Amino acid sequence: MKSTHSKIKIAHVQLMPLLSGVQRVSLQEFELLPNEQFDINLICKESGPLTDYLDDSVRAFFVPTLCRNISLIKDMKSLISLYKLLKKEKYDIVHTHSSKTGILGRIAARLAGVPCVVHTVHGFAFESTKRKSVKLVYKWLEIFAAKCTTRLICLHNEDKEICIKELYVDPMKISVIPNGVDLEKFAPAINKGDLKEKILGLKRNSFVFTMVGRLWPQKNPLYFAEAAKYIIENNLIPDSVFVIVGDGELMNDLKYNYQTDMNLKKRLLLLGWRNDIPNILKASDVFVLPSLWEGMPLAILEAQSTGLPCIVSNINGNNCLVKNEFDGFLIELNDIDSFINALVRVTDDKVLNIMSKNCRNKIVNGFNIVKRVDKIKDLYIDMVVNK
């Protein structure tokens, strides 16, 4: 049992040092957990936007062999490096994120004798895998890693049910703690037209659809771009502009397929990584996220807090945040016609205004970041004191 008068030493294990959803969830905790109670470290592959953003009180350690794809040699090297680091630093808690680092980090933590091992479920990779053999391997690894876990944090009840029924996790080991939003930082715009001119360089009357996320297959940005192309070429929504914020492996595909035509280039904007996401959302009218799988997307919550109706794929993680035709539209990934139809329908002023109010009210009443971090803090303290 650890005294509550000494600092609790925690290592958060991530893969990439980006500022996408998973990393920003951790960053919220780093910023809001009291320094007098917690000594927080970050372990990731290398330096990057996330580590550049860290407060001086947060130390960063790097494991260069960490990678997203399965590589037996690199994964074994990463496991050994993590084990040595965790053993040396003598953490009270190791808190892992995402599938790959979640598995390696939890196994290494158990081998290193870390007393408390926490994992936040940000969706399951095996849920979106079509190959049965790959799905089976991913699921087996998750089951094994769950045996190394003191506490699982699920962002919604759907993932909790998957943990219980498919990974055989004891329900008493699971806490459901939804993501949260800074309500002041992500408040609705006072003058949206001014922000469209100032932030995006667009006309005040532009109708802006925005997607924010890492440009890789999971986020499915090409699906959004294809729908945008059809709408632009057929002039279905006059003055519409489609904005994609983020970077990643699919950026070149987006440029090659959707930026060679000048009319498309003017109305399908690829902004790359940006540090002014709150202002970009405030300058937008609708948020779009056609992901293949999710945990609980912080990007959706931030967009809703800003008053943006959301058009998102009908998958676990998304469909617990968006109620169809109440605060947005749920679209099926194999039906681009219904996706395009939803993009057109949401431009109706009455629909837009009602959904916008519903979005903001829901976030204010149920997804406050301060309350979320308080729950995380209580969980940490309870685990360490009672271990």
UniProtKB/Swiss-Prot annotation:
Gene Ontology MF annotations: glycosyltransferase activity
Known cofactor(s): Mg(2+); Mn(2+); Fe(2+)
Gene3D superfamilies linked: Glycogen Phosphorylase B
Listed SUPFAM superfamilies: UDP-Glycosyltransferase/glycogen phosphorylase
Coiled-coil annotated spans: none
UniProt record, GO biological process: O antigen biosynthetic process
Keywords assigned by UniProt, alphabetized: Glycosyltransferase, Iron, Lipopolysaccharide biosynthesis, Magnesium, Manganese, Transferase
Domain of life from the UniProt record: Bacteria
EC number: 2.4.1.343
Pathway(s) per entry: Bacterial outer membrane biogenesis; LPS O-antigen biosynthesis
Reactions catalysed, as given in the entry: N-acetyl-alpha-D-glucosaminyl-di-trans,octa-cis-undecaprenyl diphosphate + UDP-alpha-D-galactose = alpha-D-Gal-(1->3)-alpha-D-GlcNAc-di-trans,octa-cis-undecaprenyl diphosphate + UDP + H(+)
Database matches in InterPro entries: Glyco_trans_4-like_N (IPR028098)
Role of this protein: Involved in the biosynthesis of the lipopolysaccharide (LPS) O-antigen region. Catalyzes the transfer of galactose from UDP-galactose to GlcNAc-undecaprenyl diphosphate via an alpha1,3-linkage. Has strict substrate specificity.
Family: Belongs to the glycosyltransferase group 1 family. Glycosyltransferase 4 subfamily.
Further details from the record: Activity was assayed using the synthetic lipid carrier analog alpha-GlcNAc-diphospho-decane (GlcNAc-PP-De) as the acceptor.
Protein name as annotated: UDP-Gal:alpha-D-GlcNAc-diphosphoundecaprenol alpha-1,3-galactosyltransferase
Upper classification of the organism: Bacteria, Pseudomonadati, Pseudomonadota, Gammaproteobacteria, Enterobacterales
